[in-house]
Design a protein with these regions (language model features):
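Nucleotide-activated sugar donor-binding and catalytic core shared by glycosyltransferases
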Residues: 1-156
Length: 156
């Protein structure tokens, strides 16, 4: 399991929490050579999220747990990851609705449900399908933003 904390300054607290569960951690910044006995790999560096979205079969967007509007799922969907999220997706309602209609995203209600869903094996065909749909959704979103900007420019 890979964890990419939104706030890198919290890494020490996250490590303490994980290790209190008798799980072994490794931090990306330390460039560990052997990951054989590692339970949780923590990406504690900036600018590398895309690299990990490319290799992950599913992504849990933790920003959707708290009541702040959620987290943008397009980046992960673009790379073919299945999107798992909490109940708070208000800032991205239309995107999540579309992802759900293609069975790419799933709302998680309990920690136990999350644990059961992230343990499935990666299915190459599913990943390719999700990647294609994610790219289509991203292109559509970019087109809508371009249209919005062009309409605003015409008004001035």
């Amino acid at each position: 399991t890979i964890i990419i904390p939104r706030h890198v300054h919290r890494v020490k607290d996250i490590i303490l929490e994980i290790e209190s569960l008798n799980l072994k951690t490794a931090c990306h910044s330390k460039k560990p050579k052997n990951l054989t006995n590692i339970d949780i790999y923590i990406v504690d560096t900036f600018g590398e999220t895309n690299k990990f979205h490319k290799i992950g079969s599913s992504v849990f967007l933790g920003g959707s747990i708290i009541k702040r509007g959620g987290q943008n799922p397009l980046e992960a969907a673009r790379y073919g990851a299945r999107i798992l999220h909490g109940p708070n997706t208000d800032n991205f309602k239309d995107i999540y609705k579309l992802l759900k209609s293609f069975k790419i995203s799933k709302k998680i209600n309990t920690p136990k449900e999350l644990a059961s869903l992230i343990s499935f094996k990666k299915n190459k065909n599913t990943g390719v399908k999700i990647k294609k749909i994610g790219k289509i959704i991203l292109k559509k979103t970019i087109k809508e933003i371009d249209n919005l900007i062009n309409n605003e420019v015409k008004k001035t």
